[in-house]
Amino acid sequence: VQWTAEEKQLITGLWGKVNVAECGGEALARLLIVYPWTQRFFASFGNLSSPTAVLGNPKVQAHGKKVLTSFGEAVKNLDSIKGTFAQLSELHCDKLHVDPENFRLLGDILVVVLAAHFGKDFTPDCQAAWQKLVRVVAHALARKYH
């Protein structure tokens, strides 16, 4: 995938302001609340019975941070995202059997979370760059499925 200098700047500039623990936890919690069928992959996380339970679940928060920390590797390696996520793609396909559509859903949720956190700083140009990034990451994670 080709990135313009402006796209790279918009992505890395915003990433530098992201609170990974807060945004990661919120993104995963929102995924589990908005798309409840995704909860089946997190049975070991305990109580996910209500939005309040999901939002307050420390395992959701911790894994959300882990997911977004990993996403940060895409930001650092914009020109080699497929390679960056090769092992994670294998893990999610072969061992965890995660539906690859869930990667797209989580990417869309992340864009919503960033918009909520950054308001006017999350301009349409910034959103377009991030939407492109989450699509590329979702595709890289789904690569092992093809």
UniProtKB/Swiss-Prot annotation:
Subunit structure: Heterotetramer of two alpha chains and two beta chains.
Lineage: Eukaryota, Metazoa, Chordata, Craniata, Vertebrata
CDD domains: Hb-beta-like
Residues holding heme b: 63, 92
Tissue specificity: Red blood cells.
Organism in which the protein naturally occurs: Turdus merula (Common blackbird)
Any single GO CC term annotated in Swiss-Prot or TrEMBL for this entry: haptoglobin-hemoglobin complex
Family indicated by similarity: Belongs to the globin family.
Limits of the Globin domain: 2-146
Keyword line: Heme, Iron, Metal-binding, Oxygen transport, Transport
Protein name: Hemoglobin subunit beta
Gene Ontology BP annotations: hydrogen peroxide catabolic process
Highest taxon listed in the record's lineage: Eukaryota
Matching InterPro entries: Globin, Globin-like_sf, Globin/Proto, Hemoglobin_b, Hemoglobin_oxygen_transport
